[in-house]
């Protein structure tokens, strides 16, 4: 069933406003950032994202990059995640956990990022991917479960267990600016296909089919 998001998710071009929201969450204004926003549990594959983000910035000497991780925590996994980040030593300064993000701030954080990582191992739909697309943020996500149906050909789909695919995708999305711009434009257009009206129509059709089948 195709879901949707609130109408407040839009691409924001006001740099001053974006910087204001970044400051609210402690994101340095002199840093570029790669963004991930999700419920922080093991199936979101966050340790994989962090590991490959660090490979990306080290290989390409991108000292001005950080990885911004937003979302609510599952307590047991938070401890595991924190331990992994602490074990990074000096590199841990490149990982910024900002916790829960207020709804009214999400569009600004999406709009201010370089790309969105969502290599989830399993999704029923993948609303954060749709939110990012609506806000003009190019997406790298898994090629599994529902995510290919959401992203279509508007981003890069990877094997969520492949370090090499993730690294290549990040390099493609950052260094190929024409490709990145095409992903932004196509993502915004594709996101318009997902509406709550369409969701209601699909549910209604399914219910009617079930009722007719049951007669």
Predicted regions span which residues?
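Carbohydrate transferase catalytic cores enriched for Leloir-type hexosyltransferases
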Residues: 1-215
